Each structure stands twice: as structure tokens, then as C-alpha cells.
Amino acid sequence: MAFPLPRGITPPEIAFLAEMEMVTILPRQRLEGLELLGGQVEPLLPPRRASLPLWLALLLKRQRRANILPPAWLHPEPLSLILEIETQHHEYENAFSPPPPLPGQPSVRDRNRGQRPIARARHTPDGQRYFPSPPFLPQNIAQDNAHPSEPPSLPYHWLEVGNMLLDAASDDLVDPDQIRRLLKELREVRMAKIRSGVDVLDAAATGGGGVALTGVGAMEIGESRGFVTGVVDGLRKIGASKEQARREQMAEEMANGGYDATQDDEDEMEF
């Protein structure tokens, strides 16, 4: 007997998509440029840094041909600050820490300078314009010149990228044990917020509200999809039965009211 297909994308499929994230490596050997489906890979010339897809960087790491430089957010200090925002700031008590700005969205530095960012469109080989989105945004590359006013933020594939780098390149990370602990605590805190958001699903199921998912990661959405959709379906059925009972009650009241008014008119005519 075959099991029914799960709703939406599964966690292994999400992890597969996360392997397209661009990361920074420090090559140990020379490697000629490659033509991949996702685009051209520049030649690797030690000790010059290069940006590669995560799957290729992990392959070179396993072959001991490169070291992976951790992204700016995958350090103990930024993760501790994000965990503090998630747990101690009242404005994020029922919300998630802000994600990195997308192309065309102002950052903190842009707001301070009063500048308006410009979203730069890219073009396909046949000339069509498009705007990239994760995993095709540079949200996981190493940054040495990060602006101090920019608060740390978790990218869309933070959980997948962090676990992959901990498994395959823990020797390239700063204090991997603490990073693993912080990632676990962040996941528990954020999943608790998702589960606590069930209270507002009653209004969302009947079209009277919605659930804010700003800052939620891809794996978090994939893992909670079955739970949330099951709750919404159950609430929708309960709401439908309540609506049907309300309509029947209104119809009964209208019928009784119409009957009483007719009787009163007949009594007045007889009098």
C-alpha cells in the first residue's frame, strides 16, 4: 500500500535546493572554470577567494581541495545576538527576527543615509528580465567589511546551510560546538513561536485574518506545513459547521417571527 504524497515540498527537497546557495571558499589547488546549469564558475586560483554553489564547495572540501569560509551570520557573536532578539525583545515576542533585505528593500544603512536602494534586474540567455530570490542571492558569502550598524540576520536557508557546514566543514568554523548549540536553541525558540501562532489560525481559516511569516526559514516552513495545514483544515470544518448552525438558527427565527406577525395582523382585523 502506497502512502499519499506529502503536501508541499519535503525537507530533503528543501535541503537539495539549499545546496544552490553561494558560499565563499579559499581554494588549495588550481581549478579551471566550469560551465554549470546555474551559470559559469570562475577559475580557482589559490589563495584568491571564490564564490561557489554550496554543493560544489562541499565536494571540494571533502576532497581537501578547498576550505569554506563561514558566512557572516554563522559565528557565535551574531547567533547570540539573534537569539537575544528572538527571546528578550518585546517587539519580537510573537514575531521572528528580521531577515536580510531583498534586492530593492532598504537596509539599516540605507535608511540612515536617506538613500533608496535600486533593485538590479538580471537577464536570462533569451533576454528576459528577472529578479533573483533565495537561493540565488548572496546571503551566505563571507564578509570582512560588514557595516557595524547592520544587525545580523538569518537568511532563508539558514538551518540547512548551518547544518551542512557543521557536518562537512566544522574545522573551518569558529567554535563549532557553540554554533551547534546556538542553532539548536534558535530552532527550538522559533518553532515554539510557530506552534503558538495557532491561536490566530481560527480567524485566518474563516477569512478574517492571517499569519505573519516574515523571517521564517525554508526548512521551518516545510516542517510546520503539515501541522499548520491540518489545523487550518480542522478549523475550517468547525467554522463551516458553526456557520451552518447559525444560518439554520436565523432561518428558524425569521420563520417564527413571520408567523407571529401574521397572527397579530389577523387578531387586529378580527377586533
Curated annotation (Swiss-Prot):
User: Which Cys-Cys disulfides exist here?
Assistant: none
The keyword Nucleotidyltransferase is assigned to this record: no
**Which region ranges are annotated with the description Disordered?**
93-130, 243-271
Query: Pfam families annotated for this entry?
Result: PSF2_N, Sld5
Q: Which UniProt keywords apply?
A: Chromosome partition, DNA replication, Nucleus
Tell me the compartments it is located in: Nucleus
Q: Which residues form a coiled coil?
A: none
Task: Tell me the domain of life.
Answer: Eukaryota
Q: What Gene Ontology biological process does one annotation of this record name? A: chromosome segregation
Q: Report biased composition (Acidic residues) as residue ranges.
A: 262-271
- Kindly report the protein's main subcellular placement as a broad class: nucleus
Identify the InterPro entries for this entry.
Answer: GINS_A, GINS_bundle-like_dom_sf, GINS_Psf2, PSF2_N
Please provide, in alphabetical order, the Gene Ontology terms of the cellular component aspect for this entry: GINS complex
Q: Which family does it belong to?
A: Belongs to the GINS2/PSF2 family.
What does this protein do, in the record's words?
The GINS complex plays an essential role in the initiation of DNA replication. Has a role in chromosome segregation.
Assembly with partners or alone: Component of the GINS complex which is a heterotetramer of sld5, psf1, psf2 and psf3.
What protein is this chain from?
DNA replication complex GINS protein psf2
Q: Which gene carries the instructions for this protein?
A: psf2
